[in-house]
Amino acid sequence: MNREISVVDYHHEVLTAWAALRKKLSFPPAVWTLDYHTDTMPCFRGAMPPPLPGAWADENTVADAVRTLRHDEHFDWALRAGIISEAFIGICGDDNQITAHEAMHVVRPADFPGSDVILNSPEKFRPQAEQMLSSSFLAALFPRLPAENEIYILDIDCDYILCRNALYPADDRLIQQLVQNAALITLSRENDWVKILKLPGETITGTEVASIIATWR
């Protein structure tokens, strides 16, 4: 199927595009996500009840969810509603050991420093930050990658990119493969978080990151 790209301001807003893709399929696809940090919160911790299976079919229900959800609660909502089957979430910030749903898999490199080092001693972290889209890094990060001909979503929160050089790894075969074979790519600008988390001296913005990735073919 033809690849689609959706660019939003905030991560939870990707739910709209995920639900639209689900309507075209007879099954829920898996999603592979890259994010600085994932909250893994249950979608119903606020005033919103958990969705019923199949809630993705009603546009008003999805729109209400987007208005109500915050942070990364959309993962739990999408799993409970049957929009996606699994979520493989690669992060570089501190890991959450407990997730809101058993099909939500948060993964982080074992040798990564904690957020205290990333934020307080960023130059020590720069060599790793520059490799976070490299083929070797992504292959080691995810417990599994999409199978050949698998229909899936590639989801990138732009605050995962902490420096401009990260967008240009020497070996970009795997990220390009993930981009080219995805049924849907969702990009969250998250400009405020990119501004907070980017390494010193970097001028990259979430809008720029999303624009660059959206041109990859």
Predicted feature descriptions by range:
Residues M1-V31, F44, M48, P53, ...:
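Catalytic cores of soluble, metal-dependent hydrolases
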